Amino acid sequence: MMNITRRDAIRSMVTGTMLFPAIVQDLLGAQTANPLAPRAPHFPGKAKRLIFLYMTGGVSHVDTFDPKPGLVKAVNEGKKPQGNFKSYLPGAWEFSPSKATGAEVSSLFPHVSGILDEVALIRSMVAAHNDHFQASQGLHNGSVTVKRPSMGSWVSYGLGTENQNLPSFVVIAPYLPYAGAINWTSDFLPGAHTGTRIAGGAEPVADLNRRTPTAELQQLELGLLDRLNNQHLISRPGDNALAARIKSFEIAYGMQSEMPEVLDLSKETDATLKLYGLERGDNQGFAWQCLIGRRLAERGVRYIELVDSGTTKNWDSHNEIDEMNAMAKNADQSIAALVKDLKSRGMLEDTLVVWATEFGRTPWLEQTHGRGHYNKCFSCWMAGGGIKPGIVYGKTDELGLNVAENPVTVHDFQATILHCLGFDHTKLTFRHAGRDFRLTDVHGNVVNALLA
């Protein structure tokens, strides 16, 4: 068929030439392979999907999941941290043993404390960078130096989706986290594996509703646009941005039929809304994100990331550590509710839930009454599909300065997540620029002690 420009196509539609039947015939012809078709992993993974709870900004380990009474002793004895820092800063919240496992958790997370029997708590995480942008990129993309495909994109590439009317990778983020959309880029992977962002509010998904007078006219318009776009792509092989744009039209069309139902909470019971801390009509906030995350998981979305930014602020507590009160209150109940809800529906056994942050905070005072960035040790946790519940793994020293036992690097963390989903992280690769790339690069070991 001859090359057709967009101008030609529009002119032909207006003047009623014989162009359109030929396009329809082509559209009914051979179909290209679907990059989001369901695919089998390397081995049967215990998890079929992942919900990634991302606490952007850097959560203080010594104020949440890693109690350090040694900080009080250090202050009383007049010990000073190295460098030009004034003093150590003891945790401001009381720690008490979880009724579920006995592991100590601070009063910031009373609800999460109640689900620790489902959780593998890691107290020995180590990140490769001390800056938000690079550390966020490292946690999500496996590299602190250059942009690479995100973990969600790798999972989408490896598993595809179980629902062709929804993206395989969805990010619910009312505000952009550090490193922005790099956290969900597909980079050199096929563009269909880029994360789709939901923001919340009155229009959670931008431009979701059709603007054409009828659905039939929209189908004709999209069919023509798809034909022209694919002709354009043939002349530009390897243009990943164009391929992503083309696939976005297909996904957007499918989302028009299914996403409104996902976002409609009217059929959720009063008991479920109360569990999450929601009121009827709520359409934003982290509780809303968690419930929508569960609904996406039910409908076959493979990778769901929930970015907790609280308000326009985040967990980056340089000046006032007390800001963590509001941040934790915003997230604690809904995080615990999500785990409980998944379990009550029989979904926790094949859904991996991950709670993570890009790094921890300094055990010493910074600025007025806050803590600085600290990548030498911090805490994260996992629950659900493939994870051994009710354990604490790793240990830091008495002041929370360094890992004392069983360090877990970000690449180890990623390798373990991929293992739960059925992947050998060394074999989930993509050929680009003359070599095979993978999420963990040349690093990473599965932490077998975390596995069920």
Where are these regions (language model features)?
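Ligand-binding pockets and gating/stacking loops
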Residues: 1-452
